[in-house]
Curated annotation (Swiss-Prot):
InterPro entries per record: NA-bd_OB-fold, Ribosomal_uS17, Ribosomal_uS17_bact/chlr, Ribosomal_uS17_CS
Organism: Mesorhizobium japonicum (strain LMG 29417 / CECT 9101 / MAFF 303099)
Single GO term (MF): structural constituent of ribosome
Phylogenetic placement of the source organism: Bacteria, Pseudomonadati, Pseudomonadota, Alphaproteobacteria, Hyphomicrobiales
Gene3D superfamilies: Nucleic acid-binding proteins
Keyword Ribosomal protein among record annotations: yes
Signal sequence bounds: none
One BP annotation, GO: translation
Entry keyword Ribonucleoprotein: yes
Protein name: Small ribosomal subunit protein uS17
């Protein structure tokens, strides 16, 4: 099974080798037929502490690194 890749924004880089990435998901509500935005925060491994708050990054699913980390930052989208 392929590993999932998500795009999001770094909202915290205070932890060592860890960033918190906010991923936004949009979908049409099945009853109201209105576009709904939902966000979720993921802790991702950032080996070199290269990413700062506000950066757009891609994260990839991986094996568990710690209690909360199951994602790795794979690349940065400099937009």
């Amino acid at each position: 099974m392929p590993k999932r890749i998500l795009q999001g924004t770094v909202v915290s880089d205070k932890n060592e080798k860890t960033v918190v990435v906010k991923v936004e998901r949009r979908f049409t509500h099945p009853v109201m037929k209105k576009t709904v935005r939902m966000t979720k925060k993921y802790k991702a491994h950032d080996e070199n502490n290269a990413h700062k708050v506000g950066d757009q990054v891609f994260i990839q699913e991986s094996k568990p690194i710690s209690k909360d980390k199951r994602w790795i930052v794979v690349s940065s989208d400099q937009a």
